[in-house]
């Protein structure tokens, strides 16, 4: 007999106003945002106690569409469909899974492309700098509106892992556990360096127009180039040998191509650059990469070590063997610092060749550890 077809998980974007003139969002910088909307999606149902929710935090160019489809005929599901859904590790029959687009983003949440209520035109570079802590504080307001009393867990990869750690330090009693994947409580110097080169590609594009390029093509070449460099940091040498090797693009003979695309790996990078330009705002790219640079769990908390002592949640830190952007010593350090202050933390390493993007491309490698961790948290909650 043929297996029954798997039902399509349908979802929709929702919007919540989390800051108003009467209740502004005060940022770490001291600046205020008086009108903030977050775009979010919900999968599964929140239980009456309000304690079965899992917050998924997305990476740099992600959005709220973590899983499912908006329509049955959508060609592609959300960006982490392997992880979220009925019977999956983040089981929507069991948990209420919530994902929001971050503050400063461009996929429905307030960011530099949003209209500045003071001027009636897009903020552009008048938008204040935001930090990961600011993102988390905005998310906390959203969860309050949704009736979430206590999170079962916060999970995310890359920038999402930074958010998970910030959640545990800012709101120590609001979750039972966190699962930061390929991230850290502060960005390392090489990561900041990668981000600065990407930003310069955007800032030096003649189409940038001081950040007020809305209504024009914008800095398309700069954003595409930034994405090309970013993609290099998301993969590994091993994965590039496997996927591309030194293979020429099509029938091209590299000896006769001059500086045109000659190799498959070059073609891939150009393709990724073009794809991002179609769906992402260059200003958001600037703001979110800077938020990663500014990430420092210890800021205002005495020291980096003291910040980890604030964490009461259980921690499952996931490293990726081949990660160039967030090397595994960073996740091991997180575990050591939490344990040093008496907290509970464990480390799991993905033995994947796919580099930083392995949490998206090789999720089955960590499905069982995550499923087990969540079930243990649930058992503790019900004990």
Swiss-Prot record:
Pathway: Amino-acid biosynthesis; L-methionine biosynthesis via de novo pathway; O-acetyl-L-homoserine from L-homoserine: step 1/1. It is an enzyme of class 2 (transferase). One of its GO terms (molecular function) is homoserine O-acetyltransferase activity. The gene is metXA. This is Homoserine O-acetyltransferase. It comes from Symbiobacterium thermophilum (strain DSM 24528 / JCM 14929 / IAM 14863 / T). Belongs to the AB hydrolase superfamily. MetX family. The active site is at residues 158, 323, 356. One of its GO terms (cellular component) is cytoplasm. InterPro entries: AB_hydrolase_1 (IPR000073), AB_hydrolase_fold (IPR029058), HAT_MetX-like (IPR008220).
């Amino acid at each position: 007999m043929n297996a029954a077809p798997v039902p399509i998980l349908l979802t929709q974007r929702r919007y919540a106003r989390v800051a108003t003139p009467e209740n502004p969002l005060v940022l770490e910088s001291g600046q205020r945002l008086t009108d903030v909307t977050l775009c979010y999606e919900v999968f599964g149902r929140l239980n009456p106690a309000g304690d079965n929710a899992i917050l998924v935090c997305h990476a740099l160019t992600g959005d709220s569409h973590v899983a499912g489809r908006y329509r049955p005929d959508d060609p592609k599901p959300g960006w982490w469909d392997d992880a979220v859904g009925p019977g999956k590790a983040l089981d929507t029959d069991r948990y209420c899974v919530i994902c929001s687009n971050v503050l400063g983003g461009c996929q429905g949440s307030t960011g530099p492309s949003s209209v500045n209520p003071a001027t009636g035109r897009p903020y552009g570079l008048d938008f204040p700098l935001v930090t990961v802590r600011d993102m988390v504080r905005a998310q906390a307001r959203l969860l309050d509106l949704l009736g979430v009393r206590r999170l079962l867990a916060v999970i995310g990869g890359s920038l999402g892992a930074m958010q998970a750690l910030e959640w545990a330090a800012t709101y120590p009693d609001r979750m039972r556990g966190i699962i930061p994947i390929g991230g850290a409580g502060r960005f390392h110097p090489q990561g900041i360096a990668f981000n600065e080169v990407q930003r310069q590609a955007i800032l030096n594009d003649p189409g940038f127009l001081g950040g007020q390029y809305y209504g024009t093509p914008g800095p398309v070449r700069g954003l595409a180039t930034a994405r090309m460099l970013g993609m290099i940091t998301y993969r590994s040498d091993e994965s590039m040998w496997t996927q591309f090797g030194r293979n020429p693009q099509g029938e091209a003979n590299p000896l006769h191509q001059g500086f045109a695309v000659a190799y498959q790996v070059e073609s891939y990078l150009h393709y990724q650059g073009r794809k991002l330009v179609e769906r992402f705002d260059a200003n958001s790219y600037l703001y979110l990469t800077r938020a990663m640079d500014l990430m420092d769990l210890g800021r205002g908390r005495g020291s980096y070590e003291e910040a980890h002592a604030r964490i009461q949640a259980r921690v499952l830190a996931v490293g990726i063997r081949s990660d160039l952007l967030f090397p595994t010593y960073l996740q091991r350090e997180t575990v050591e610092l939490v344990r040093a202050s008496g907290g509970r933390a464990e480390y799991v390493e993905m033995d994947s060749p796919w580099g930083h993007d392995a949490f998206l491309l090789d999720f089955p490698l960590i499905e069982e550890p995550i499923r087990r961790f969540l079930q243990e948290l649930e058992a503790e909650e019900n004990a």
